[in-house]
Amino acid sequence: MADISTKTSLQPSTRTTDILSYSHDASHYLLKPKAIYTPETKEQLAEIFALATELGIGVTFRSGGTSLSGQATSDGFLVDTRKNFRGIKVGSQGVQVSVSPGATVRAVNTSLARFKRKLGPDPASEVACTIGGVVANNSSGMCCGTEQNSYRTIASLVLVLPNGLVIDTGASDADEILQQKSPSIHAGLIALR
Protein backbone atom coordinates (compact mmCIF):
# COMPACT_ATOMS: atom_id res chain seq x y z
CA MET A 1 0.00 0.00 0.00
CA ALA A 2 1.16 3.54 -0.75
CA ASP A 3 2.44 5.70 2.09
CA ILE A 4 -0.75 7.22 3.44
CA SER A 5 0.82 9.23 6.24
CA THR A 6 1.27 12.33 4.08
CA LYS A 7 -1.91 12.05 2.02
CA THR A 8 -4.21 13.91 4.44
CA SER A 9 -3.81 16.65 7.04
CA LEU A 10 -4.60 13.99 9.63
CA GLN A 11 -1.91 11.51 10.66
CA PRO A 12 -3.34 7.97 10.76
CA SER A 13 -2.18 5.36 13.21
CA THR A 14 -0.66 2.22 11.74
CA ARG A 15 1.02 1.14 14.97
CA THR A 16 0.72 -2.59 15.54
CA THR A 17 -0.77 -2.14 19.02
CA ASP A 18 -3.47 0.19 17.67
CA ILE A 19 -4.22 -2.07 14.71
CA LEU A 20 -4.62 -5.06 17.01
CA SER A 21 -6.76 -3.24 19.56
CA TYR A 22 -9.12 -2.00 16.82
CA SER A 23 -9.24 -5.45 15.15
CA HIS A 24 -11.92 -6.55 17.61
CA ASP A 25 -15.31 -5.27 18.64
CA ALA A 26 -17.92 -7.03 20.77
CA SER A 27 -18.38 -9.63 18.01
CA HIS A 28 -16.27 -12.70 17.26
CA TYR A 29 -14.83 -11.16 14.08
CA LEU A 30 -11.17 -10.24 13.65
CA LEU A 31 -10.31 -7.79 10.88
CA LYS A 32 -7.11 -5.76 10.90
CA PRO A 33 -7.61 -2.21 9.62
CA LYS A 34 -5.02 -0.73 7.26
CA ALA A 35 -5.05 2.51 9.25
CA ILE A 36 -6.97 4.15 12.07
CA TYR A 37 -8.08 7.75 11.75
CA THR A 38 -9.43 9.96 14.54
CA PRO A 39 -10.66 13.06 12.72
CA GLU A 40 -11.58 16.23 14.58
CA THR A 41 -13.56 17.95 11.83
CA LYS A 42 -15.95 17.18 8.99
CA GLU A 43 -13.29 18.49 6.60
CA GLN A 44 -10.80 15.87 7.80
CA LEU A 45 -13.44 13.21 7.33
CA ALA A 46 -13.91 14.40 3.75
CA GLU A 47 -10.13 14.03 3.22
CA ILE A 48 -10.28 10.44 4.48
CA PHE A 49 -13.13 9.67 2.07
CA ALA A 50 -11.17 11.21 -0.82
CA LEU A 51 -8.07 9.16 -0.03
CA ALA A 52 -10.09 5.96 0.39
CA THR A 53 -11.75 6.57 -2.98
CA GLU A 54 -8.39 7.25 -4.63
CA LEU A 55 -6.91 4.02 -3.23
CA GLY A 56 -10.06 1.88 -3.56
CA ILE A 57 -10.17 1.18 0.19
CA GLY A 58 -13.35 0.84 2.23
CA VAL A 59 -14.12 3.10 5.21
CA THR A 60 -15.71 1.82 8.42
CA PHE A 61 -16.85 4.01 11.30
CA ARG A 62 -16.37 2.98 14.90
CA SER A 63 -17.47 4.59 18.11
CA GLY A 64 -18.44 2.25 20.92
CA GLY A 65 -17.61 -1.05 19.22
CA THR A 66 -20.47 -2.73 21.09
CA SER A 67 -22.19 -4.41 18.15
CA LEU A 68 -22.27 -8.19 18.26
CA SER A 69 -22.44 -8.36 14.45
CA GLY A 70 -19.00 -7.01 13.52
CA GLN A 71 -19.96 -3.64 12.04
CA ALA A 72 -17.15 -1.88 13.94
CA THR A 73 -14.31 -3.91 12.41
CA SER A 74 -12.65 -3.39 9.05
CA ASP A 75 -9.75 -4.42 6.88
CA GLY A 76 -9.83 -0.95 5.29
CA PHE A 77 -9.66 2.46 6.93
CA LEU A 78 -11.22 2.61 10.38
CA VAL A 79 -12.54 6.00 11.51
CA ASP A 80 -12.90 6.47 15.27
CA THR A 81 -15.69 8.97 15.91
CA ARG A 82 -15.85 8.50 19.67
CA LYS A 83 -12.80 10.53 20.63
CA ASN A 84 -13.62 13.84 18.99
CA PHE A 85 -17.32 13.84 18.16
CA ARG A 86 -19.06 13.77 21.56
CA GLY A 87 -21.10 16.97 21.46
CA ILE A 88 -24.54 17.12 23.10
CA LYS A 89 -26.77 20.21 22.87
CA VAL A 90 -30.15 20.02 24.55
CA GLY A 91 -32.80 22.39 23.22
CA SER A 92 -36.53 23.03 23.47
CA GLN A 93 -36.76 22.04 27.15
CA GLY A 94 -35.44 18.59 26.31
CA VAL A 95 -37.90 17.97 23.48
CA GLN A 96 -35.01 17.99 20.99
CA VAL A 97 -31.34 17.21 21.35
CA SER A 98 -28.50 17.60 18.87
CA VAL A 99 -25.91 14.87 19.32
CA SER A 100 -22.60 13.98 17.67
CA PRO A 101 -21.98 10.33 16.74
CA GLY A 102 -19.41 9.65 19.49
CA ALA A 103 -21.65 10.55 22.43
CA THR A 104 -22.85 7.56 24.44
CA VAL A 105 -26.54 6.92 24.98
CA ARG A 106 -25.94 7.22 28.73
CA ALA A 107 -24.33 10.67 28.33
CA VAL A 108 -27.27 11.88 26.23
CA ASN A 109 -29.82 10.50 28.68
CA THR A 110 -27.94 12.12 31.57
CA SER A 111 -28.20 15.47 29.74
CA LEU A 112 -31.93 14.93 29.18
CA ALA A 113 -32.69 13.72 32.72
CA ARG A 114 -33.08 17.23 34.16
CA PHE A 115 -36.05 17.64 31.79
CA LYS A 116 -37.43 14.22 32.79
CA ARG A 117 -36.81 12.93 29.28
CA LYS A 118 -34.68 10.26 27.60
CA LEU A 119 -33.93 8.95 24.15
CA GLY A 120 -36.32 6.46 22.58
CA PRO A 121 -33.73 3.74 21.91
CA ASP A 122 -32.65 1.97 25.10
CA PRO A 123 -29.96 -0.58 24.18
CA ALA A 124 -28.56 -2.63 27.07
CA SER A 125 -25.06 -1.35 26.27
CA GLU A 126 -26.07 2.31 26.79
CA VAL A 127 -23.02 3.03 28.94
CA ALA A 128 -20.69 2.25 26.01
CA CYS A 129 -22.71 2.33 22.79
CA THR A 130 -22.79 5.61 20.91
CA ILE A 131 -25.36 7.55 18.95
CA GLY A 132 -23.49 6.88 15.69
CA GLY A 133 -23.87 3.13 16.12
CA VAL A 134 -27.42 3.39 17.44
CA VAL A 135 -28.49 5.37 14.36
CA ALA A 136 -26.49 3.26 11.89
CA ASN A 137 -28.04 0.05 13.21
CA ASN A 138 -31.49 1.48 14.02
CA SER A 139 -30.97 0.14 17.52
CA SER A 140 -33.96 -0.05 19.75
CA GLY A 141 -33.57 -2.04 22.94
CA MET A 142 -36.11 -3.91 25.02
CA CYS A 143 -38.54 -1.11 25.81
CA CYS A 144 -38.78 1.12 22.75
CA GLY A 145 -39.91 -1.40 20.13
CA THR A 146 -40.59 0.12 16.71
CA GLU A 147 -42.35 3.29 17.87
CA GLN A 148 -39.31 4.87 19.51
CA ASN A 149 -36.43 3.35 17.57
CA SER A 150 -33.73 5.53 16.01
CA TYR A 151 -35.44 6.06 12.67
CA ARG A 152 -38.66 7.29 14.27
CA THR A 153 -36.98 9.71 16.67
CA ILE A 154 -34.58 11.51 14.29
CA ALA A 155 -35.59 14.96 13.07
CA SER A 156 -32.53 15.52 10.86
CA LEU A 157 -28.91 14.53 10.28
CA VAL A 158 -25.75 16.34 9.23
CA LEU A 159 -23.89 13.97 6.92
CA VAL A 160 -20.48 13.94 5.28
CA LEU A 161 -20.98 12.03 2.05
CA PRO A 162 -18.24 9.95 0.44
CA ASN A 163 -17.68 12.69 -2.16
CA GLY A 164 -16.96 15.18 0.67
CA LEU A 165 -20.25 17.06 0.49
CA VAL A 166 -21.60 18.05 3.90
CA ILE A 167 -25.39 18.07 3.91
CA ASP A 168 -27.81 19.03 6.68
CA THR A 169 -31.05 17.16 6.04
CA GLY A 170 -32.87 19.65 8.26
CA ALA A 171 -32.11 22.55 5.92
CA SER A 172 -35.03 23.60 3.73
CA ASP A 173 -32.85 23.43 0.60
CA ALA A 174 -31.12 20.12 1.42
CA ASP A 175 -32.83 18.22 -1.41
CA GLU A 176 -31.93 20.86 -4.00
CA ILE A 177 -28.31 21.06 -2.79
CA LEU A 178 -27.93 17.28 -2.94
CA GLN A 179 -29.48 17.12 -6.41
CA GLN A 180 -27.22 19.92 -7.67
CA LYS A 181 -23.91 18.87 -6.07
CA SER A 182 -24.30 15.08 -6.00
CA PRO A 183 -26.79 14.11 -8.71
CA SER A 184 -25.86 10.40 -8.72
CA ILE A 185 -26.34 10.09 -4.93
CA HIS A 186 -29.61 12.03 -5.17
CA ALA A 187 -30.86 9.78 -7.99
CA GLY A 188 -29.89 6.67 -6.02
CA LEU A 189 -31.81 7.84 -2.97
CA ILE A 190 -34.87 8.67 -5.09
CA ALA A 191 -34.69 5.17 -6.61
CA LEU A 192 -34.81 3.66 -3.11
CA ARG A 193 -38.18 5.28 -2.40
Language-model-detected regions and their locations in the chain:
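N-terminal flexible segment immediately upstream of the FAD-binding catalytic core
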Residues: 1-54, 64-95, 124, 147
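Residue-level detector of anion-binding/catalytic polar loops
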Residues: 57-58, 118
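Solvent-exposed beta-strand sheet faces enriched in polar/charged residues
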Residues: 60-62
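FAD-binding subdomain of flavoenzyme oxidoreductases
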Residues: 88-91, 100-101, 105-193
